Structure formats: structure tokens, C-alpha cells
């Protein structure tokens, strides 16, 4: 029987330099949709939990007076701080190295707490209860943001081949084994769902849902796709050890065979937003 998976600090080790280039962005219109749904006017405070390199926090920063991003990975926070400086947001952003389960004292009260594809990595009941205590009692919002899992994203009609996802996944398995890797452990059953039940038990009585539509055509280079693979927890660079160079060479050969021009087409995923109010 496989031991239960436990978080460790290597989960995203080495992925930060690849993250921004490799991950597809959230759907255009997400900040505007969130602002309209929650009445955001630039005066509140945002807590982004599991912020990574600021992928979500920085595009939302103009909606708040202050943004606090929390992440346990120092590489992610360094990327976030660098990008915030480039956007002229240093004075409005703060980056805190901590696990969500160990949020430090003194963070203050927040209007909104966001979790962008991060909540499933956490002790969700503990984090939900802690974050509820940090949110405004009169309508503070716990916001879960992720790519919409339903709906086809065919590249049909676009100018370049689709990314050969199944072949890439097979290559990762050849190097790392058949069971999904996650830090130093294995994750055979994937990450958990059921956020509604978790948040209800934590005392969030109201839920809203909105979908920000995607579907826009995207052009991706071989370098973009390689970065995407190396940004994932299950194919993080450190997992390959001394074979990282060989894996990347095989991956590039696979991609150039699929598209000799070195270009791929994808469609922007839609973004699902679920909101629980205090």
C-alpha cells in the first residue's frame, strides 16, 4: 500500500524560472470579471495563497490597495518580486515565504483571499479555517481560481499542429516511472477535489461561480512547451537528477518531429472562478 502523500519543500523546486513562460495564462478578462463580481475598487487588500511567481497576484494588483503573496518556494518569490518591480508595483506588493498552514501573525485583515491552482496542495480544512479568520467578516471572499476542466480545446483550424500532449506524458513516464511524482513522494490518485464541502465545514455559507471564457488562439514555440513541462510538479527539473539533459534533448526531438517548424497552436483555456463569502 502506498504511503499517504505529504508535502515537502521540493514540490516545485527548480520550476520557478520556467513557470511564467511555460504556463498558459488565465483567460483574458479575469480581473474585470472579478472586480465586477466583488465590487473591487482599488481600496481593499488581497492575500494570494500559494502565489508562485505572482501569476495571479500581479494582474489583480490594480484592484487593491495592497497585495500580499505567500509561497513556501524562495525561487517563486524571487520571480514574483522581480516581475513586480518591472511592473512598478514594488510599493503595493509584499512577498512572504511561508506555507499556507503556517501563515505568520500580523498579516492583517483582507478583502479577498485567492488560491490560483494551489488549494489542492494544502491541508485544506486547516487553511480554510485560518484564512476565514483573516477575511473581513462582512463579505470577505475566499476565491478559488483554476482552468475550466470541461470543454474541448481543439487546435482544429489553427495554423500549427497541436502540442503532442500524450507523447510528452509518455516520455515523462519513461524517465520518472508510471506513477505521478510529487516532491519526494508519489501521487497515484491525483490531487483532491470537493472544495465545496471543505469550505462549508469551515463556515463559508455562500458560493458563487463564474466562468471567464477562453478559446483564443495561442502560438507556442518549442521553448515554450519545454518550459511548460519543466514548470510542472510532476516533471520538475530536480526529479530527473543527472538525466535532466537527456530528458530535455529527447523532449525537443519529440517536439521537432511533431512540428518541424517548431511552432504549435493551442486555445486559451477558460477560467473557472468559485467564490465563497464570509
Name each region found by the language model.
Residues 45, 53-102:
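Class I SAM-dependent methyltransferase SAM/SAH-binding core
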Residues 117:
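Short catalytic micro-motifs in class I SAM-dependent methyltransferases
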Residues 104-112:
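A short acidic, Gly/Pro-enriched loop at the edge of an enzyme's catalytic core
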Residues 1-41:
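Conserved class I S-adenosyl-L-methionine
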Amino acid at each position: 500500500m502506498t504511503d499517504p502523500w505529504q508535502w515537502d519543500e521540493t514540490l516545485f523546486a527548480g520550476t520557478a524560472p520556467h513557470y511564467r513562460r511555460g504556463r498558459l495564462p488565465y483567460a483574458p478578462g479575469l480581473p474585470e470579471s472579478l472586480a465586477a463580481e466583488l465590487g473591487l475598487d482599488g481600496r481593499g487588500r488581497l492575500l494570494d495563497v500559494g502565489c508562485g511567481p505572482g501569476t495571479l497576484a500581479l494582474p489583480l494588483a490594480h484592484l487593491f490597495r495592497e497585495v500580499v503573496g505567500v509561497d513556501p518556494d524562495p525561487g517563486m518569490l524571487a520571480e514574483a518580486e522581480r516581475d513586480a518591480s518591472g511592473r512598478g508595483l514594488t510599493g503595493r506588493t509584499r512577498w512572504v515565504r511561508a506555507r499556507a498552514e503556517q501563515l505568520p501573525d500580523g498579516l492583517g485583515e483582507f478583502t479577498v483571499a485567492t488560491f490560483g491552482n494551489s488549494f489542492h496542495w494544502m491541508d485544506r480544512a486547516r487553511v480554510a479555517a485560518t484564512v476565514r479568520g483573516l477575511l473581513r467578516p462582512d463579505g470577505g471572499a475566499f476565491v478559488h481560481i483554476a482552468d475550466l476542466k470541461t470543454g474541448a480545446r481543439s487546435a482544429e483550424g489553427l495554423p500549427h499542429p497541436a502540442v503532442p500532449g500524450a507523447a510528452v506524458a509518455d516520455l515523462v513516464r519513461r524517465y520518472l516511472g508510471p506513477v505521478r511524482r510529487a516532491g519526494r513522494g508519489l501521487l497515484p490518485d491525483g490531487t483532491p477535489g470537493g472544495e465545496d464541502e471543505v469550505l462549508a465545514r469551515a463556515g463559508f455559507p455562500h458560493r458563487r461561480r463564474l466562468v471567464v471564457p477562453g478559446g483564443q488562439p495561442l502560438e507556442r514555440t518549442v521553448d515554450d512547451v519545454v518550459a511548460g513541462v519543466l514548470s510542472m510538479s510532476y516533471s520538475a527539473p530536480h526529479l530527473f537528477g543527472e538525466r535532466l539533459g537527456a530528458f530535455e534533448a529527447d523532449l525537443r526531438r519529440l517536439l521537432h518531429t511533431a512540428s518541424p517548424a517548431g511552432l504549435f497552436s493551442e486555445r486559451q483555456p477558460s477560467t473557472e472562478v468559485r467564490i465563497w463569502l464570509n
